[in-house]
């Protein structure tokens, strides 16, 4: 391990018998987890970079820790497209792919299978600790040129962020809580809120990632309390859509897209727990938290600060340097702000200005609309003279939706045309990529 002051422990669990995870309905202790980490670390190839493709969240956590033990950097990619993986491999020729399933990277990238059974020796083992400056992860964003852009995360920055989030969310009062996530751990929000938060705060991550509402409810019911649900607005909306009973939880965390206040209120009432929304980005990680039923104002995690200049809003904190945020922010002070929307989402039509996020909020707030999104068509000269929208609204027609929108937004921003779809092409975190929307628009334009 590299030198440096005060190495940072992998785990926040204080006893070998503390529960680190739940897998296949059974608790996994810290001692067992550390034995798995040591056993896997011995089997990893001598490489510098790894894409951890493990679907099982427990195995992913073991793989992450084993890579840290071997001083290997874990790469988090914006998608699992084979072409992207090959492009990344050109930049990192010592890359390999760790998998626990049938998914393979393709091309010339070496794949390493997570063993079905690791030899476990439950002897007392010291908890690994790593230098704060150790390179832990490279988180890739799509990049303005279409070429993935890496953002380096040190172990110190990742651990500090998880501890700051835990302090703001009050997880100390939920000692040993089980974390169930509907989001993949290969993306920043999932990594921070379902893996690192558990490891650093002495919580228990859940190996599975249920998708369908009935499966999510069953998985929650199977967990002991306290229990925390980590999800997204689109998953939350699906969970609450049928109006049926959902299990009581002790906290709900939500991120990746704007959360409608009405949905937040419904979630708190149905789950019987506070819902906290997390704001962040791949470049900076998690930055701020708010409880939407109480306030629209975001408050930065301890150690994070904001400033503004002619370029926009900058954030510093958690040892990650200074990052320019890609959002329109109304700064109250260096710790508190209101979020106005994405910089790239701003539209100006007939001298009137708004954001696509604002319009999406009003669209999805219409009774009977299950999902929806506004898009700004690419027009000659770069000017936007009209907007389009895609909507999932069985039981409604265009007249009903446009009539409801007229009561909520300026007529200049009404969608022309309005397309009805059975589902929007959201990814595993509930996001809609620009490319996915472009393909959807092209499909309808060709009809």
Summary of predicted features, one role per range:
Residues 27-29, 128, 136-163:
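Conserved AMP-binding A3 loop
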Residues 90-101, 152-168, 174-238, 251, ...:
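AMP-binding/adenylate-forming
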Residues 2-16, 117-140, 172-179:
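Conserved pre-ATP/AMP-binding loop-to-beta segment of ANL
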Residues 241-294:
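Gly/Ser/Thr-rich phosphate-binding loop
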Residues 14-44, 153-156:
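Conserved AMP-binding/adenylate-forming core of the ANL superfamily
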Residues 326-413:
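AMP-binding/adenylate-forming catalytic core of the ANL superfamily
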Residues 41-80, 176-177, 181-185, 353:
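Conserved AMP-binding/adenylate-forming
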Residues 347, 388-390, 404-447:
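Conserved C-terminal "lid"/linker of ANL adenylate-forming enzymes
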């Amino acid at each position: 391990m590299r030198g440096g002051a005060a190495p940072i422990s992998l785990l926040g669990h204080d006893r070998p018998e503390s529960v680190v995870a739940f897998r296949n309905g059974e608790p996994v202790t810290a001692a067992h987890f550390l034995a798995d980490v040591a056993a896997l670390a011995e089997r990893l190839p001598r490489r510098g970079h790894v894409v951890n493709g493990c679907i099982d969240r427990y195995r992913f956590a073991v793989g992450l820790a084993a890579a840290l033990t071997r001083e290997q950097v874990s790469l988090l990619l914006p998608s699992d497209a084979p072409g992207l993986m090959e492009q990344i491999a050109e930049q990192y020729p010592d890359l390999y792919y760790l998998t626990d399933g049938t998914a393979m990277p393709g091309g010339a990238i070496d794949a390493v299978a997570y063993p079905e059974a690791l030899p476990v020796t439950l002897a007392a083992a010291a908890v690994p600790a790593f230098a704060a400056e150790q390179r832990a992860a490279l988180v890739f964003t799509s990049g303005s040129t279409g070429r993935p852009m890496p953002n380096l995360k040190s172990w110190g920055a990742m651990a500090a962020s998880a501890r700051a989030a835990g302090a703001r969310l009050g997880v100390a009062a939920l000692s040993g809580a089980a974390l169930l996530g509907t989001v993949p751990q290969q993306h920043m929000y999932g990594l921070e809120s379902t893996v690192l938060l558990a490891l650093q705060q002495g919580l228990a991550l859940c190996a599975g990632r249920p998708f369908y509402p009935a499966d999510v409810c069953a998985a929650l019911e199977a967990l002991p309390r306290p229990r925390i649900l980590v999800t997204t607005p689109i998953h939350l909306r699906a969970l609450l859509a049928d109006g049926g009973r959902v299990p009581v939880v002790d906290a709900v965390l939500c991120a990746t897209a704007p959360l409608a206040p009405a949905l937040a209120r419904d979630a708190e009432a149905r789950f019987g727990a506070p819902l906290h929304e997390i704001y962040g980005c791949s470049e900076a990680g998690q930055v701020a938290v708010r409880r939407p039923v109480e306030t629209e104002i975001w408050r930065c995690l301890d150690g994070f600060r904001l400033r503004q200049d002619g370029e926009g809003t900058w954030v510093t904190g958690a040892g990650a340097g200074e990052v320019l945020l890609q959002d329109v922010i109304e700064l109250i002070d260096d710790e508190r702000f209101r979020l106005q929307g994405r910089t790239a989402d701003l539209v100006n039509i007939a001298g009137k200005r708004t954001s696509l996020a604002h319009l999406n909020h009003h669209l999805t707030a219409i009774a009977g609309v299950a999902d929806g999104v506004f898009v700004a068509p690419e027009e000659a000269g770069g000017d936007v003279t009209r907007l389009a929208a895609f909507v999932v609204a069985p039981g409604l027609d265009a007249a009903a939706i446009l009539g409801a929108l007229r009561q909520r937004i300026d007529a200049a921003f009404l969608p022309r045309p309005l397309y009805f779809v059975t589902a929007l092409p959201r990814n595993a975190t509930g996001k809609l990529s620009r490319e996915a929307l472009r393909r959807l628009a092209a499909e309808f334009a060709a009809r």
